[in-house]
UniProtKB/Swiss-Prot annotation:
It comes from Xenopus laevis. Component of the commander complex consisting of the CCC subcomplex and the retriever subcomplex. Component of the heterotrimeric retriever complex formed by vps26c, vps29 and vps35l; within the complex interacts with vps35l. Component of the heterotrimeric retromer cargo-selective complex (CSC), also described as vacuolar protein sorting subcomplex (VPS), formed by vps26 (vps26a or vps26b), vps29 and vps35. The CSC has a highly elongated structure with vps26 and vps29 binding independently at opposite distal ends of vps35 as central platform. The keyword Cell membrane does not apply. This is Vacuolar protein sorting-associated protein 29. PANTHER family: VACUOLAR SORTING PROTEIN VPS29. GO terms for molecular function: metal ion binding. Keywords: Cytoplasm, Endosome, Membrane, Metal-binding, Protein transport, Transport, Zinc.
């Protein structure tokens, strides 16, 4: 089962669109679920995601026009409970102790957060944490040179194989990270 994880698009305020090389990779009919950390900013960005997969889950980012998106969401995909937050509620941004507390409060196997616009994936106390970064490479308050990235999770039984796609220069680099639920 393929799950696209992305966020912090900031279209059209900070970027015009997804990188063309990412659009070529993201084709309709291949992905079953989309988990978005927010800051899509417009309905057009949401409509684009709906063309890629029928099952789209979004949480509200601090720049989203749609105030109906929830602050947090728990989604079950296969054997995994996945928590989804934007990340602006994590202080300081990306703080491990704050993320671990949210993971415990949501009682999830995987916690997905954004806001920092920098990709990160790691295991901590037998739980898995993913920050897909910014799919467009949109800048944030602390950093101008953001590497565009998104994540594709392949969920099979008690294993998640995470593929991170990063646009470095003109090349899309792919890294593979595996997490087994214990």
């Amino acid at each position: 089962m393929l799950v696209l994880v992305l966020g912090d698009l900031h279209i059209p305020h900070r970027c015009n669109s997804l990188p063309a090389k990412f659009k070529k990779l993201l084709v309709p009919g291949k992905i079953q679920h989309i988990l978005c950390t927010g800051n899509l900013c417009t309905k057009e960005s949401f409509d684009y995601l709906k063309t890629l997969a029928g099952d789209v889950h979004i949480v509200r980012g601090d720049f989203d026009e749609n105030l109906n998106y929830p602050e947090q969401k728990v989604v079950t995909v296969g054997q995994f409970k996945i928590g989804l937050i934007h990340g602006h509620q994590v202080i300081p941004w990306g703080d491990m102790a704050s993320l671990a507390l949210l993971q415990r409060q949501l009682d999830v196997d995987i916690l997905i957060s954004g806001h920092t616009q920098k990709f990160e994936a790691f295991e901590h106390e037998n739980k898995f944490y993913i920050n897909p970064g910014s799919a467009t490479g949109a800048y944030n308050a602390l950093e101008n040179n953001i590497i565009p990235s998104f994540v594709l999770m392949d969920i099979q039984a008690s294993t998640v194989v995470t593929y991170v796609y990063q646009l470095i220069g003109d090349d899309v680099k792919v890294e593979r990270i595996e997490y087994k639920k214990s």
